[in-house]
Regions:
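Short amphipathic alpha-helix with an adjacent loop that forms part of the alpha/beta core around
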Residues: 194-204
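N-terminal glycine-rich beta->alpha transition that marks the start or flank
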Residues: 11-15, 21-67
Length: 358
């Protein structure tokens, strides 16, 4: 028997409950994994609220990523062995004691590393790494502005950006200014400063790259912060949430603003707009521009490369071993406290990763 978290209907943290049921059996090409650590992220809050693109209908189990140990192989599995430690980007389903997942979607994890620490690499640091290197294709010396710089993805971007030799700028609250500056970025107080005016005062009148994980009207202003040749990467839609629940007004505003900035990208001969979703690269599909002037290609087109996620994960492991990145684990909570983890997430009561330990 095993336990898992279930969302019976969309809503706030109060909709989460624990159920007990028989262990799952892996199907063809699947492995069953005993979960050692499962992450809690804002994407989980969006899944729970019903505002995530492609969210399944309830009931379902949240949980975007996991670290675990292979317990059983389904028919046709050849790469992994029982006892192997693996990480996986599940999108949903990780908040359980045991999970069946495709063998092809699991990446090997060294056994000597802390599972909760490595969990940061599966989603948070992977997102940051691919935003910089797979999507924006940054070069040393370029200026990069990241919104929400004190958040989980934001701090990962700043760490990886420093390794890449970038000039970094980050929007944050006054309370988080010192934390952002410690990571080597110029902090911009989004409540009291106009970030567009700040970066357009720089030599070159703007930044080379803006990373926008909020979306909505912010994306329109972010486009204006680009210098000629600049790239805007939109990778989230947290503006569609209000108090932890789906906001229809937020959705309407997000789609209107995103459509507007996409049109600007299509019409601009000198600036590009990209949309990034980590599943696109996990599932071997290159992210291409929404618009970059004449001949722009649609998102999701382009060549397939089945090794990108695995290659990038290995690069992150090397940086972790070299002590060049420092993932933070905010709290480790038992699976039974999933509701509390979501409450902490929405209160912004923690800096670092919230981890469930089944």
């Amino acid at each position: 028997m095993m336990k898992r978290v279930v969302v019976d209907h969309f809503g706030g943290p109060e909709v989460l409950r624990i159920v007990e049921e028989d262990d799952p059996r892996p199907g063809p090409g699947e492995v069953r994994v005993k979960v050692l650590a499962a992450g809690v992220s804002y994407t989980d809050a969006m899944l729970r609220a019903g505002s995530y693109l492609g969210v399944p209908n309830p009931p379902f189990t949240p949980g975007y990523e996991l670290i675990g140990v292979v317990e059983e192989l389904g028919p046709g599995c050849a790469r992994l062995r029982v006892g192997d430690r693996v990480g996986a980007l599940t999108v949903w389903g990780a908040d359980a004691e045991r999970v069946c997942l495709p063998e092809a979607g699991a990446v090997e994890v060294p056994e000597d590393l802390d599972p909760a620490e490595v969990l940061n690499l599966v989603f948070i640091y992977m997102t940051a790494y691919q935003l910089l290197h797979r999507t924006a294709k940054v070069k040393p010396g370029e200026a990069v502005l990241v919104h929400g710089a004190a958040g989980r993805v934001g701090t990962a971007v700043l760490e990886l950006g420093r390794v890449a030799g970038l000039r970094l700028y980050g929007t944050c609250s006054a309370r988080d200014r010192a934390a952002v500056e410690r990571l080597g970025a110029v902090a911009i107080d989004y409540r009291n400063e106009d970030f567009v005016a700040r970066v357009r005062a720089l030599p070159g009148e703007g930044v080379d790259v803006v990373l926008d994980g909020l979306g909505g009207a912010l994306s329109l202003r972010s486009f204006r912060a680009l210098r000629p040749g600049g790239r805007l990467v939109v990778f989230g839609h947290y503006a569609t949430l209000a108090h932890g629940r789906k906001s229809w007004r937020g959705w309407i505003e997000w789609y209107a603003a995103t459509g507007g900035v996409a049109a600007w990208g299509l019409l601009s001969p000198h600036r590009q707009v990209f949309a990034y979703r980590i599943q696109k690269l996990r599932d071997r599909r290159q992210v291409l521009p929404v618009g970059s002037g004449p001949g722009a290609l649609p998102v999701g087109g382009g060549p397939r490369n089945p090794e990108w996620y695995r290659e990038d994960f290995q690069a992150l492991l090397e940086l972790l071993r070299a002590d060049k990145i420092h993932p933070v684990v905010a709290e480790r909570l038992p699976l039974s406290e999933a509701r509390r983890a979501h409450e902490l997430l929405e209160q912004s009561a923690s800096i670092g990763k919230l981890v469930l330990i089944p």
